[in-house]
Amino acid sequence: MRDVRIRYDGKVDALYLRLDDSKVVESEALKSGIVLDFNAKKQVVGIEVLDLKRRVPKGDLKQLKVLVA
């Protein structure tokens, strides 16, 4: 099982999930504000969510918990 690193930047309201340490060689916007990062093997290694506060209700953000296995 891989470790997932989660980073939130409040200045730009962006959440980034890093799934793998391999180098990002390509990025693809799925829809407005959602970007996938791929490595050389075309595997998803990162997910960026822009405008997080607009996408997630305020009450849900307060309850956001990260489970560590």
Stretches found by the model and what they are:
Residues 12, 31, 59-61:
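Short connector loops at helix/strand junctions that flank enzyme active sites
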Residues 1, 24-29, 68-69:
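Short, solvent-exposed secondary-structure boundary motifs
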Residues 45-68:
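C-terminal structural segments of small proteins and small subunits
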Residues 14-48:
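Amphipathic, hydrophobic secondary-structure cores in small proteins
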Residues 1-12:
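Short, compositionally biased leader-like segments
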